[in-house]
Amino acid sequence: MRSFNKDEYLFREKLGYLVKGMVKARCFQLLVELSSIRSSRGIYALEDYFVKGRDLKEVCNEHDITPSYVTSLLRKLQEVNHKVIDILPYYRN
C-alpha cells in the first residue's frame, strides 16, 4: 500500500486530486483562470507548490504569506480541479 506524505494526505480524498510538483504549468494556468484566486502572491505560491514541488513552509516564507492562507488557496484550486473532472463526461459525449 502506498503511503502519502503530509501534503498529499490532505488532498487524497477524491480521484484526480492535484499533487505537489506533479501539475503541468499549462494545466495550472488554466485552473487558476477558472478559479476565483486573484492574489498574485497566492498564485505564485501555488505555482511553486504544485508545479515546482516546493515545500509549503518554504513557499510561505518566500512569498510572505501565512500557511493558513496558502492552505485555503490549495483547497480552492483542488475544488476547481474536481469540478473540471466532474464536468468532463458531459463534453466527451
Curated annotation (Swiss-Prot):
Q: Which UniProt keywords apply?
A: Fimbrium biogenesis, Plasmid, Transcription, Transcription regulation
Signal peptide range equals: none
* Entry keyword annotation includes Transcription regulation: yes
InterPro entries in the record:
Adhesin_operon_reg_prot, Fimbrial_Adhesin_Reg
Coiled-coil ranges from the UniProt annotation: none
Q: Which Pfam families match?
A: PapB
- One of this protein's GO BP terms? regulation of DNA-templated transcription
What role does this protein play? Trans-acting protein involved in the regulation of the biogenesis of K99 fimbriae (FanC).
**Designated name of the protein:** Regulatory protein FanA
Organism for this UniProt entry: Escherichia coli
Instruction: Print the organism lineage.
Output: Bacteria, Pseudomonadati, Pseudomonadota, Gammaproteobacteria, Enterobacterales
Q: Which gene carries the instructions for this protein?
A: fanA
